[in-house]
Every structure is written in C-alpha cells, then in structure tokens.
From Swiss-Prot:
Forms a complex with CDC91, GPI17, GPI16 and GPI8. Glycans are attached at N87. Component of the GPI transamidase complex. Required for a terminal step of GPI anchor attachment onto proteins. Affects endocytosis. One of its GO terms (cellular component) is endoplasmic reticulum membrane. It comes from Saccharomyces cerevisiae (strain ATCC 204508 / S288c). InterPro entries: Gaa1 (IPR007246). It is a multi-pass membrane protein. This is GPI transamidase component GAA1. A motif (Prevents secretion from ER) lies at residues 610-614. Pfam families: Gaa1 (PF04114). The chain crosses the membrane at residues 20-40, 357-377, 395-415, 465-485, 536-556, 578-598.
Length: 614
C-alpha cells in the first residue's frame, strides 16, 4: 500500500495525469493502429500454425476410395437424363429424382414451402447404427450463380446409389435436393428440426455439392465454410475436406482465389486470403450463399465443395471427396469438439486461432472507450455532476436514437427501398450545415453526446467480437473516423449577458461551480470553423452505417453493384435470419445519430467557481 501511495505521489508531482489526459486522442489512435498492425502481422512466419487433425478417429484418406471409373457410366447416364430436367417444373424434377432414389431403398419425402418451393429429401438408414445420428449430402438444383447444377445433381444421386451398397455406415445418410442453396435449403433445415415427419436423427455434418458444368473434367475445388452470424464449422471438418482434396491430387481454393494464385505461399498471398476471409466471414449470408450457410444455428458442421474449370481431373475424382469425408465422419462416436470453432485460414494448410486475432478487435473497442473518456474529461466541463441536465439530456437523446434506429430497422424490412434509405442518410449528413443558424446546442451537451456515443459503440463492439469477430472488426474499422468529428463553438461578438445555472455542483469543500451561458451576438463563421464543418460533413458521410457499408461493398467486393448490399442485408434476415442488418441499425446507427447531433453548432458555457455561501 505504501508503495502505491509513493507511486501516486510521484505521478502527481511529475504532472503525468494532465499530460495523459491531453494525449487521450493520440492514445485512442494508437490503440486503433495497434489493432490494424496486430491483424496485419499474422501472415508473417512464426505467427501462424500449420493445420492438423485434432480428432484421431476421423483418419482422412486412410482408406482407399472406391468411387472411381466403375461409377463413371452410371454417373454419365444420370447426367444425360438430368440435362433434360432443365425446363421441367420443380415438382416434375423432384418426382423423377425421388423415383430414382427409391429404386435403391431410400425413403423419400417432399417438403413443401409456399414461399420457397419444394425440397426433395431421402433418408438411407444406417445398417450398423441406431438411427440417432445422420450426415447430409445437399445438392441445390440451382447454385449461387443461378446455374443449373447438372453435375452436382448427377453426383448426388450416383453417390446415394453408391452409399446404399455399403454396409459400413453407422450414421444415417440424408440426401437433399433443394431449389437453391439459400432460402429453400434453409427452410428445409428449419423444418427438419421442427415439423418434418421423416427424419434420420441429429445431423452431425453436411456437405453441399456444386458442379454446374456439363463437362467430364474440372480443374480445382473451392471450399466454402463461412457460416451465418459469426459461426464457423469445426476446423477438423475443414481440414479433412482440404486433406482429402489434396490427397486426390486436386488444388484447393479459398474465398474465390483464382487458379493462377493457388500455388502462391508468401506473406502477401497469406495476407490476401486473410483479408478475403474476414470480408466473407463478416458478410456471410449477405453475399451469395454457397449452401453451407443454411445449416448454421443447429450445431451442424458444414462445407460446400465447388468445382471450377473444365480440364484436368474427372468428375468421379470430385465424387471421392464427399465419399471420403462421409467415411471419416462415420467414424466419430461424438459430435465435433476437439478442434477450433474460431479461426482464420491463411492458406489451405495454415491458420491462426482466436487467441492470435482477437486482440485486434479488442484494441479497436478500447480505442472507442478512450475516445469516450476523452469526450468526458478532456474539456472545461469535466467537473459537471453526473446528474446534471447535460448528462440527463444526453442519455435521453441516446434513448431516442435507439428508438429511431429500431423503427428504421423494422420499416425497411417492410419497405426495402435502398434508394430511399440512402437518400435519407445522405440528407441527414447535411443537417448540421444547413441548420447551423437555426439549431444550437450547448457545448457541454455536445461533449456528453460524444461520450455516450463512443461508450455505447465500445460496449456493442466488445459484446460482438466474441461471437462475430469479423463483423466487430469491420464496423469498428469503418466507424472509427467518427472519433475525429469535432465540436464547433459558434463565433460571437464581444458583449455577453450571463445567467447563473440552477445546478451548482460542489467540487471542493468551500467552492461551487457556477455555469454561465454565453448569450452573444453571433458573427459569421471563421475560415477555420468552415473548414472544420466541411471536415465533419465528410466524416459523417463516410461513417454513416448504410453509406459506409455500401462503399465497402463497392470497393472491396465485385459481387455488389449500386445499393445491392442494402437490399441483401434485409433479405439475409428475412431468408436466413442473418442479423447483420440489426448490427448496423441497433449497434452502429444510434452512435452515428448521437455524433450527428453533437456536430451542430454549440454555445459555450462558462464555468466559474465561487466561494460557498454560509
């Protein structure tokens, strides 16, 4: 205790506290910079690890794969008939496919959804199991690019026929043919766990096939694994998919990496995959779904296998990947649990765990907390009581901003007009500039609004970073320029009339604070103030959640055009229950509204101390 007192006296004597308080904006920037650097150094040698299989029972590629040339003619026969299904109705396709599945003993049923169409599924009961566990082989009729999944459907029925002849299965196998990998497949997964009569037990894992080409050959395999709302499949499942694919001689692509970059393994290639992974993880459900996203939320580990190119490996080689994966999963005696559920892949065989990448998002959250502290104490109004009118009004404005944000989130679910939303967002940014002579707030209130805004955003980011790291990092990065919005005090002439505040606050035993509001004749803004107003305007535009996420989509993802990302955020909630839309509306928008309110011109309040009356 004596040591702490001595240290405290030394700090006071050296005057470190005022210096630290004055440097709070710099400390906030350094925290954010540390967050960016800590994520950027992960691809450096020594910062990442090589992937490995944690669950020994999986044993990928330990057994010989039998889905080979013997199945070639059968697969081609199914494919030639599936080509004729392109112009058939969903009912006709499902009835024909269902008859094929029934030929080798599969129990089939059709799940009908008025909004998303029909989904055919069949259950093959395990000869060596008790019927309580299952594996899913999902084949959407149309893939994420709206291409008819001819090769995938042919592989699906061929593999089902192939699996039916094997007596080794201890888990049921469910084959699913949905209209698309998005809402149709998601609705079937929800119905399977709630209302379907024909079921095959708890689903342990799912593999989605995407082979839209009519060619016999393909070049490489893209493996997609990002789930909804920050979920990822157990790393063991991703590892066995990669291990089996490479064991069969095929190259693996992650996050849409083109074929000419698959052999690169240096700092820049790993950094690129890292950035693409964070982007795809944050926007999973908003981007075109691959199919594995549909299984999120039910403790089902899932990946999507997509074939690219038209030369190199034959189609049966592609079929050996799900065969070997099912044989590995079949060995499990319990659910996936040994390996990581939170990770970032830098290459097919290299990854970093949550302990390595989490500090970056934590640093951003701390940066907002420090900005909140700076707005609270680094001004002339630090000694105002916590129960003063300024603090109470700031909390009231925060509550109103929450209500407005909630109304916005619900209104645009009913009327998804991205153009209207962007127009309102852009117009709101100009309000402090347009109404600068009509609406004023007190300077203490401006600082308190910033204090509440940054504190709220820090709490949101901290709550989010454990369950959806990528989204926390994304919104923290895009919203951080808000901390540079400055309070603008209006210019005034020399004479002033003062009024005493009705809230005297004790600071010392014999002193009270007297708040004196300046009532001055305003003069035109100085060039410096005009410059700061324009700077605030630019910062408000760039940090508006809807404008910012739109710009991010346009610059960093070729999939989005115009205001598409706003509509897809809404549809992601309606179709997949992906709550990224509410993160923007309830987590980010209230903070931005508070900063918008704080950027209106303010009137200074003079703080004077007076001797306490007896």
């Amino acid at each position: 205790m004596a040591l702490l007192e001595k240290l405290h006296r030394r700090i006071v004597d050296m005057g470190l506290v005022p210096r630290i308080i004055a440097l709070l904006p710099v400390i906030s920037m350094l925290c954010a910079l540390f967050g960016f650097i800590s994520i950027a150094i992960l691809p450096m040698d020594g910062q990442y690890r090589r992937t490995y299989i944690s669950e020994n029972a999986l044993m990928p590629s330990q057994a010989y794969s039998y889905f080979r040339e013997s199945e070639w003619n059968i697969l081609r026969g199914y494919r030639s008939q599936i080509k004729e299904m392109v112009n058939m109705t969903s009912m006709e396709r499902n009835n024909l496919m269902g008859s094929w599945l029934q030929e080798f003993g599969t129990k089939t049923a059709i799940y009908e959804n008025e909004q998303y169409g029909e989904t055919l599924y069949g259950v093959m009961h395990a000869p060596r199991g008790d019927g309580t566990e299952a594996m899913v082989l999902a084949v959407p009729w149309f893939n994420s690019d709206d291409e008819f999944n001819i090769g995938g459907a042919a592989l699906g029925v061929s593999l089902a026929r192939f699996f039916s002849r094997w007596p080794v299965w201890s888990k049921n196998i469910i084959v699913v043919f949905s209209e698309n990998p998005r809402a149709a497949l998601r609705s079937w997964v929800e119905a399977y766990h709630t209302s379907l009569d024909l079921t095959g037990g708890s689903i342990e894992a799912a593999v989605v096939l995407d082979y839209s080409s009519t060619e016999d050959f393909f070049e490489y395999v893209e493996i997609s694994y990002d789930g909804l709302n920050g979920e990822l499949p157990n790393l063991d499942l991703v590892n066995i998919a990669i291990s089996i694919t490479e064991h069969e001689g095929m190259k693996v692509s992650l996050h849409g990496l083109p074929s000419d970059q698959l052999t690169n393994n240096n700092f820049w290639s790993r950094l690129k995959i890292l950035c693409l992974g964070i982007r795809d993880w944050a926007l999973s459900g908003v981007k075109k779904p691959h199919g594995n996203e549909a299984f999120s939320g039910w403790r089902i580990q899932s990946v999507t296998l997509k074939a690219h190119g038209n030369s190199g490996h034959d189609i049966t080689t592609f079929g050996r990947i799900p065969e070997a994966m099912f044989r590995s999963i079949n060995n499990l005696l319990e659910k996936f649990h040994q390996s990581f559920f939170f990770y970032l892949l830098l290459a097919p065989r290299q990854f970093v765990s949550i302990s390595s990448y989490l500090p970056s998002a934590v640093a951003l959250s701390i940066a907002f907390a420090i900005s909140s502290l700076n707005a609270f104490i680094n001004n002339a109004y630090a000694n105002i009581s916590l129960f003063s009118e300024y603090n109470l009004v700031a909390l009231l404005v925060w509550f109103v901003s929450l209500v407005i944000s909630f109304v916005v989130s619900q209104a645009f679910l009913l009327i998804p007009s991205s153009g209207l939303l962007m127009t309102i967002s852009m117009a709101s940014c100009f309000l402090p500039l347009i109404l600068s002579r009509k609406i004023h707030i007190s300077e203490p209130l401006s600082y308190r609004l910033k204090n509440v805004a940054f504190l709220y955003f820090s709490l949101v980011s901290t709550s989010l970073l454990m369950i959806n790291f990528a989204m926390a990092l994304l919104i923290g990065t895009l919203a951080f320029p808000m901390t540079f919005v400055k309070t603008i005090v209006e210019s005034s002439s020399e004479h002033e009339v003062t009024t005493q505040s009705s809230n005297p606050i004790k600071t010392e035993p014999k002193d009270e604070i007297e708040l004196v509001e300046n009532h001055m004749d305003t003069t035109p803004a100085t060039p410096q103030q005009q410059k700061q107003k324009l700077k605030n305007l630019v910062l408000l535009i760039l940090t508006n959640p809807f404008i910012s996420i739109t710009l991010f989509g346009l610059f960093f993802d070729d999939e989005f055009h115009g205001f598409d990302i706003i509509n897809k955020l809404v549809s992601a909630w309606l179709d997949l229950k992906c709550w990224s839309w509410f993160v923007l509306c309830i987590g980010w928008l209230p903070c931005w509204l508070l900063i918008l309110a704080s950027s209106f011109e303010s009137k200074s309040v003079v703080v004077r101390s007076k001797e306490k009356q007896s």
